[in-house]
UniProtKB/Swiss-Prot annotation:
Keywords: Chlorophyll biosynthesis, Chloroplast, Iron, Membrane, Metal-binding, NADP, Oxidoreductase, Photosynthesis, Plastid, Thylakoid, Transit peptide. Its main location: plastid. The gene is CRD1. CDD domains: ACSF. It is found in: Plastid, Chloroplast thylakoid membrane. Belongs to the AcsF family. Its EC number is 1.14.13.81. This is Magnesium-protoporphyrin IX monomethyl ester [oxidative] cyclase 1, chloroplastic. Pathway: Porphyrin-containing compound metabolism; chlorophyll biosynthesis. It comes from Chlamydomonas reinhardtii (Chlamydomonas smithii). Residues 1-10 have a biased composition (Polar residues). Residues 1-28 are annotated as: Disordered. Induction: Induced in absence of copper and oxygen. Regulated by CRR1 protein, which activates its transcription in absence of copper. One of its GO terms (biological process) is chlorophyll biosynthetic process. GO terms for molecular function: magnesium-protoporphyrin IX monomethyl ester (oxidative) cyclase activity; metal ion binding.
Length: 407
């Protein structure tokens, strides 16, 4: 189910699934996300539309763009209610809470005078693709902020410890979103996050699906950030903007968030040890991996501007994320079988043709898409039935597999 908050309010339909108060309650501090930017000649010819001076029109929503999520908050409350679940294992959850309270990055996201000067030196195609990267990243972080903030509000009475953890995660996500939106203003653009809150389409996921998906999102985010950071530390000439210097500490927020969501899953064994859990584990792994792989291959010029090979980078991130996920999920796809990435590479080629047809004004473009969509669906099915690994050795650190990876 996909609706905007504006449409829901207009129709008078209010549901526990929709985070209606997030627009009012979940608004971060003014200094965190509200920025101002003025249009500048450097952005002329890059193809960006503005709502008003310096405020960018959000990118069109597609299957691959960052989504805003909502869930059945009443059901989520029941999952972690102490009254309903008196034997809920809180030991690991409380350990995560103490980590969040430490707020290791409280003073990390402090800008310096190098940001704006560096932004003014980024021009042409590199400028365009980096602005797109900042927008997508900001939107994804802000989406997490809205979801976590509303979960914290709704669970405060039934499970105060879990609610506080979601609240502290929303603090981190707001910081990240604000930092990225401020970076956008260095490029003379910014997002109106309040407008996005009210007008973005919200995708409904059941509570357990939210936990699976956000766990994977946080863990893959960790590997993306740390991989880029380590690469640029070894190749400083490729670092054209100081944002990347913050990725080492930043990625630890993502890792801690993933650890908390892992603890949520372990506190509810039925989310990990049933046949249904095996099916959903593999499905969400594939969904996250496919989305990232196709997205990034549409933006190879961004990774090339950092001196990265897009294909090697993506495969490294997926392999490492999968290895981390093996310690928790009962089943994961065998991504280290070379045939796995062979199928993904075929999907990249088909997706490129679909993108080209979407931009075409030809009246036959819709018909020309049909065989490509059929081929894409067949590749998805191949991956769904692809060789899998029965794993789930929870809390076993590391991996005995040899690591001949690019980064």
């Amino acid at each position: 189910m996909q609706t905007t908050l504006k449409q829901q309010r207009a129709s008078g339909r209010v549901s526990a699934r929709q985070p209606f108060r997030s627009a009012a309650v979940a608004r971060p501090r003014r200094s965190t996300v509200r920025v101002q930017a003025s249009a500048a000649p450097l952005n002329d010819g890059l193809g960006f539309e503005t709502m008003r001076d310096g405020i960018k029109v959000a990118a069109k929503e597609t299957l691959l763009t960052p989504r805003f999520y909502t869930t059945d908050f009443d059901e989520m409350e029941q999952l972690f209610s102490k009254e309903i679940n008196p034997n809920l294992d809180m030991e690991e959850l409380n350990a995560c809470l103490n980590e969040f309270r430490n707020d290791y990055n409280k003073v990390h996201f402090v800008r310096n005078e190098t940001f704006k000067a560096a932004a003014d030196k980024v021009t042409g195609e590199t400028r365009r693709i980096f602005i797109e990267f900042l927008e997508r990243s900001c939107t994804a972080e802000f989406s997490g902020f809205l979801l976590y903030k509303e979960l914290a509000r709704r669970m405060k009475a039934s499970s105060p410890e879990v609610a506080e953890m979601f609240l502290l995660m929303s603090r981190d996500e707001a910081r990240h979103a604000g930092f990225l939106n401020k970076a956008l203003s260095d490029f003379n653009l910014a997002l109106d996050l309040g407008f996005l809150t009210k007008n973005r389409t919200y995708t409904y996921f059941k509570p357990k699906f939210i936990i699976y998906a956000t766990f994977l999102s946080e863990k893959i985010g960790y590997w993306r950030y740390i991989t880029i950071y380590r690469h640029l530390q070894r190749n400083p000439d490729n670092q054209f903007y100081p944002l990347f210097e913050y990725f080492e500490n930043w990625c630890q927020d993502e890792n801690r968030h993933g650890d908390f969501l892992a603890a949520c899953l372990k506190a509810k064994p039925e989310l990990l040890n049933t046949f249904e859990a095996k099916l959903w584990s593999k499905f969400f792994c594939l969904s996250v991996y496919i989305t990232m792989y196709l997205n990034d291959h549409q933006r190879t010029k961004f990774y090339e501007s950092l001196g990265l090979n897009t294909r090697q980078f993506n495969q490294h991130v997926i392999i490492e994320t999968n290895r981390a996920t093996e310690r928790l999920f009962p089943v994961v796809p065998d991504v280290e079988d070379p045939r796995f990435f062979e199928i993904l590479n075929k999907m990249v080629d088909v997706n490129a043709k679909l993108v080209e047809l979407s931009a075409s004004s030809s009246p036959l473009a819709g018909l020309q898409k049909l065989p490509l969509l059929e081929r894409m669906a067949s590749y998805c099915l191949q991956l769904l039935f692809f060789k899998e690994k029965d794993v789930g050795s929870v809390d076993i650190a590391g991996s005995g597999a040899s690591r001949n990876l690019a980064y």
